Design a protein with these regions (language model features):
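Catalytic center-proximal scaffold of phosphoryl-transfer enzymes
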Residues: 1-309
Length: 309
C-alpha cells in the first residue's frame, strides 16, 4: 500500500490497489498507512556524529540545492468556538526543501539526504550522506552548485579545509550569455566560446577585464544591466572558479545531478497538481522518498516484518 502511496497520489494509489490486487481500500487508509511509515523512516534517519578516524575514500562529489514544495495550513478548532468550515481557513504557500547528494567519482548511486529545516540541518544531512558514502579524515570534498551563500557556508562548516567548492559552470554561463548579447551582438557565439575557454583555463580576471568597459551606469535598473550582473556574479565567486583544476582531476563542473534529483526524489510525487501538504506530513513523505532513493526500501520492510513476527 505504501509502495503505491510513495509514487502516486493517494487516490491513484487506491485505484492501483484495486486494479492489481482487487482490493478496495479507502483513500484515507492509503494516506494514513503511507504517512505512518514515512514517520517511522523519519525517526530512523541517522544523525550527524563525530568524523571517523580512518582515512576514508580519496574524493567525494557533493551537491546541495533547494526547491519549493507546496504546503497548506488549516486553522485548528478552538475549544468552545462554534463549529465552522475549516476549509475556509486554508492558507497555501511554498516551503523550501533542501536536498543533498554525495558519491565517489564514477558512482551512479549517490547517497541522499533532505530536510525542510534550517540550512544548518541541511548541512548535517550533507555530512551524514558523506559519512555513509565513505568519508574519512583524509577525504577531499568536491562541491559544485549555484554558489548560494548558505551552501558554500555549509560546505566549510561541515568539511572545513577538506572541501573545495565550484560554481556551476553552466549557471555562470547564463550570466555570461546575457552579457554577451549586449557586448557582442551577432558575434555572440564566437565571443561566448572564447570566454568559456578562458574560464576553463582559470582566466576569470581576463573575463572581468572584457566586461568592465561595458558596465552599465549605476542608475540603470538591475533587469536592464546584464553586464553588471555578470561582472558582480564572477567577482563575488572568485574563490569558487577553479575549473582548470576540476577538469584536470576529472571532476564535474556542473550541478545537473542535483537538479535532476529534485525532480525524481521530490517533485514527481510531492509537487503535483492540486497536491498541498501539511508540513508535518510533508516531512514524512520526504523521508520516505529519500529512503527509497537510497535503496533502503527492502531493508526497512524486512525489519518491519521481523519485528511483527
Amino acid at each position: 500500500m505504501s509502495d503505491f502511496g510513495a509514487d502516486h497520489a493517494f487516490a491513484g494509489a487506491a485505484s492501483k490497489l484495486k486494479e492489481h490486487y482487487g482490493i478496495a481500500v479507502p483513500v484515507s487508509a492509503v494516506r494514513g498507512f503511507t504517512e505512518e511509515h514515512g514517520a517511522a523512516m523519519l525517526a530512523q534517519e541517522k544523525q550527524k556524529s563525530d568524523w571517523p578516524n580512518h582515512a576514508g575514500v580519496p574524493v567525494l562529489i557533493t551537491e546541495m540545492d533547494g526547491s519549493m514544495l507546496p504546503v497548506v495550513e488549516v486553522a485548528e478548532p478552538v475549544l468552545g468556538e462554534a463549529r465552522r468550515d475549516r476549509r475556509k481557513t486554508r492558507q497555501v504557500s511554498w516551503k523550501e526543501a533542501r536536498l543533498a547528494l554525495v558519491h565517489p567519482p564514477g558512482s551512479v548511486t549517490p547517497r541522499f539526504g533532505a530536510t525542510l529545516g534550517s540550512v544548518e540541518e541541511a548541512g548535517e544531512r550533507l555530512a551524514v550522506c558523506a559519512w555513509e558514502a565513505g568519508a574519512g579524515s583524509q577525504t577531499k570534498f568536491h562541491g559544485v552548485g549555484d554558489g548560494a551563500v548558505w551552501i558554500t557556508e555549509q560546505m566549510e562548516a561541515q568539511f572545513g579545509t577538506q572541501a573545495q567548492y565550484l560554481v556551476d559552470f553552466y549557471h555562470l554561463c547564463e550570466y555570461l550569455s546575457a552579457a554577451g548579447e549586449v557586448i557582442a551582438g551577432n558575434d555572440k557565439p564566437a565571443w561566448m566560446e572564447k570566454k568559456k575557454k578562458w574560464l576553463k583555463d582559470n582566466r576569470w580576471k581576463d573575463v572581468l577585464g572584457t566586461l568592465r568597459p561595458y558596465l552599465e551606469p549605476a542608475n540603470i535598473p538591475e533587469p536592464a544591466a546584464p553586464v553588471r550582473a555578470c561582472f558582480r556574479y564572477i567577482s563575488n565567486h572568485v574563490n569558487f572558479l577553479d575549473y582548470k583544476g576540476a577538469l584536470a582531476a576529472g571532476l564535474p563542473i556542473g550541478s545537473g545531478e542535483i537538479e535532476s534529483a529534485h525532480r525524481y526524489v521530490f517533485q514527481n510525487r510531492l509537487k503535483i497538481a492540486g497536491g498541498w501538504w501539511k508540513v508535518e506530513n510533508l516531512k514524512k513523505m520526504i523521508a520516505l522518498r529519500v529512503l527509497r532513493a537510497n535503496g533502503g526500501w527492502a531493508d526497512y520492510w524486512s525489519k518491519v516484518h521481523q519485528e511483527a513476527a
